[in-house]
């Protein structure tokens, strides 16, 4: 048996302002800093001590990993970063207010863009592509998205799962993945075999560790949040985003 922990980054400044964030590199809010620290405290209290961390190239996830490791007394463990764990690219919606977008385009279109499995938002223009960011300098231009649906996130995340995370799990390491709402939804979809339709109803709260116990074939034996009551309340708040 091996342990995998998924941790969505703490609240970001754009989460607080109800904006679509995607690949924009926004840092944690004051609340988010506390959430990330509390996530690490929950790990320590549960005796779930990471041996290795995988995170994205975005500051809010990296800082969450740092704060959680510090609170858990595990600052020395290796931290591996990959663009494949980045948040879903929200295309032309990035930077827009969710409530205003809902009002402008209507409930049906808003939910299609936000929660459907295979409907991406409008693309950004070539002048906005994240390739101008030096963190993606070694990434082939055709891999840098202009928009993504969740299916696209699954497609780019799974190679990293198999090539980087699975070997750590098979070596018996306790693995922490500190990432984003949609990159973690993509991973949960894979782990729990959630259908393309049902995944629309999955919401992952910020800063609360989700623990999986996996068998030798990496099948799920059990899973659950380390603070179930807080997770249920926070997930409901995520589902309600878009409302003023």
Swiss-Prot record:
One of its GO terms (biological process) is glycolytic process. SUPFAM superfamilies: Phosphoglycerate mutase-like (SSF53254). GO terms for molecular function: phosphoglycerate mutase activity. The active site is at 9 (tele-phosphohistidine intermediate), 87 (proton donor/acceptor). SMART domains: PGAM (SM00855). Keywords: Gluconeogenesis, Glycolysis, Isomerase. Its EC number is 5.4.2.11. It catalyses: (2R)-2-phosphoglycerate = (2R)-3-phosphoglycerate. The record marks 180 as: Transition state stabilizer. The keyword Transferase does not apply. It comes from the Bacteria. Pathway: Carbohydrate degradation; glycolysis; pyruvate from D-glyceraldehyde 3-phosphate: step 3/5. InterPro entries: His_Pase_superF_clade-1, His_PPase_superfam, PG/BPGM_mutase_AS, Phosphogly_mut1. Substrate binds at residues 8-15, 21-22, 60, 87-90, 98, 114-115, 181-182. Catalyzes the interconversion of 2-phosphoglycerate and 3-phosphoglycerate. Belongs to the phosphoglycerate mutase family. BPG-dependent PGAM subfamily. This is 2,3-bisphosphoglycerate-dependent phosphoglycerate mutase.
């Amino acid at each position: 048996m091996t342990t995998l922990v998924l941790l969505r980054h703490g609240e970001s400044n754009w989460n607080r302002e109800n904006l679509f964030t995607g690949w924009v590199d926004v840092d944690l809010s004051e609340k988010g800093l506390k959430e990330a620290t509390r996530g690490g405290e929950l790990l320590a209290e549960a005796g779930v001590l990471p041996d290795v961390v995988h995170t994205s190239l975005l500051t809010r996830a990296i800082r969450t990993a740092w704060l959680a490791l510090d609170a858990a007394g595990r600052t020395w463990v290796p931290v591996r970063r990959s663009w494949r764990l980045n948040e879903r690219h929200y295309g032309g919606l990035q930077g827009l207010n969710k409530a205003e977008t809902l009002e402008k385009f209507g409930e049906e279109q808003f939910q299609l863009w936000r929660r459907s499995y295979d409907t991406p938002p409008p693309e950004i223009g070539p002048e906005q592509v994240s390739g101008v960011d030096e963190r993606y300098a070694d990434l082939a231009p055709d891999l840098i998205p202009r928009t993504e649906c969740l299916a696209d996130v699954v497609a780019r995340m799974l190679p990293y799962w198999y090539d980087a995370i699975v070997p750590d799990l098979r070596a018996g390491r306790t693995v922490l993945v500190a990432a984003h709402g949609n990159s973690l939804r993509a991973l949960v979809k894979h782990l729990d075999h959630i259908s393309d339709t049902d995944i629309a109803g999955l919401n992952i709260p910020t800063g609360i560790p989700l623990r999986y116990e996996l068998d030798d074939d990496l099948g799920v034996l059990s899973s659950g949040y380390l603070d179930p009551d807080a997770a249920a309340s926070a997930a409901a708040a995520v589902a309600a985003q878009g409302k003023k």
